[in-house]
């Protein structure tokens, strides 16, 4: 059986990659993808904790969290694509120009 520390190391690595990508990159779609990587890292940590505690409640929470993250990704992508299509703004630095 794989120890819990390996799963937590994987989760921390994925979260770090997502956080660094979110902070460094300015493209809105890439920022959304990095945010999803961070959500998946948290889900891996939740699932591994619930598996090692033999508690199905945590795994059910992970399934609901995946569903919420999927809805968030669809709504976020729709907003970003509408913003790009209507204004041509694709970088987070240019959003300041939208203020009226």
Swiss-Prot record:
NDH-1 is composed of 14 different subunits. Subunits NuoA, H, J, K, L, M, N constitute the membrane sector of the complex. GO terms for biological process: ATP synthesis coupled electron transport. Belongs to the complex I subunit 4L family. It comes from the Bacteria. NDH-1 shuttles electrons from NADH, via FMN and iron-sulfur (Fe-S) centers, to quinones in the respiratory chain. The immediate electron acceptor for the enzyme in this species is believed to be ubiquinone. Couples the redox reaction to proton translocation (for every two electrons transferred, four hydrogen ions are translocated across the cytoplasmic membrane), and thus conserves the redox energy in a proton gradient. It catalyses: a quinone + NADH + 5 H(+)(in) = a quinol + NAD(+) + 4 H(+)(out). NCBIfam families: PRK05715.1-2. It comes from Thermodesulfovibrio yellowstonii (strain ATCC 51303 / DSM 11347 / YP87). Disulfide bonds: none annotated. It is a multi-pass membrane protein. GO terms for molecular function: NADH:ubiquinone reductase (non-electrogenic) activity; quinone binding. The keyword Plastid does not apply. InterPro entries: NADH_UbQ_OxRdtase_chain4L/K, NUOK/Mnh_C1-like. The chain crosses the membrane at residues 4-24, 29-49, 60-80. Keywords: Cell inner membrane, Cell membrane, Membrane, NAD, Quinone, Translocase, Transmembrane, Transmembrane helix, Transport, Ubiquinone. This is NADH-quinone oxidoreductase subunit K. It is found in: Cell inner membrane. One of its GO terms (cellular component) is NADH dehydrogenase complex. Its EC number is 7.1.1.-.
């Amino acid at each position: 059986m794989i120890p819990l520390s390996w799963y937590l190391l994987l989760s921390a690595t994925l979260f770090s990659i997502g956080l660094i990508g979110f902070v460094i990159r300015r493209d809105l779609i890439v920022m959304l993808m990095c945010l999803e990587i961070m959500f998946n890292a948290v889900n891996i940590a939740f699932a591994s904790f619930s598996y090692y505690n033999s508690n199905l409640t945590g795994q059910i929470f992970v399934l609901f969290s995946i569903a919420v993250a999927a809805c968030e990704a669809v709504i976020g992508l729709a907003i970003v694509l509408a913003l790009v299509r209507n204004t041509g703004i694709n970088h987070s630095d240019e959003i300041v120009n939208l203020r009226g």
